[in-house]
């Protein structure tokens, strides 16, 4: 296929993966706000009208990897993204590293700004520096 849609979800609350596998939903606590809410939103159509899968894969991202990437985006790229943006970029980089994806265009979405997360784990290091 020339286009693949890959979902991203918290490793600790993989409800999309569970739904795709026909398993009961077992959501769990995680720190990636805005994702893995314990249900699959009604507007996320996992299959098209013909019954073919639209989401071909789901990449699970840990809390630590999502936070680390969001911090890295701020520090190295000047992009103040939220934790879910960190998760999406982390997943996109992992997908891009695969040999079969060499030379392919990988696109992701920065779906949140980090401004609303300045009081969370995302900005712990920055707050500690300012406090000292």
Residue spans of the language-model regions?
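Short, active-site-adjacent cap segments at secondary-structure transitions
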Residues: 13-16, 88, 115-116
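Active-site/ligand-binding loops adjacent to catalytic centers
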Residues: 2-83, 121-132
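Phosphate-binding loop/pocket of nucleotide- and phosphate-handling active sites
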Residues: 29, 44-48, 90-132
């Amino acid at each position: 296929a020339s286009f693949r849609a890959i979902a991203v979800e918290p490793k600790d609350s993989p409800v999309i993966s569970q739904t795709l596998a026909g398993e009961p939903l077992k959501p769990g606590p995680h720190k990636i706000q805005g994702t893995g809410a314990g249900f699959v939103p009604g507007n996320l159509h996992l299959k098209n009208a013909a019954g073919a899968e639209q989401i071909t894969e789901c990449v699970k991202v840990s809390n630590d990897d999502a936070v680390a990437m969001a911090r890295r985006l701020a520090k190295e790229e000047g992009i103040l993204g939220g934790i879910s943006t960190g998760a999406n970029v982390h997943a996109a980089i992992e997908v891009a590293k695969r040999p079969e994806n060499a030379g392919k265009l990988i696109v992701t979405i920065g779906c949140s700004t980090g401004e609303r997360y300045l009081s969370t784990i995302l900005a712990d290091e920055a707050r500690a520096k300012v406090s000292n």
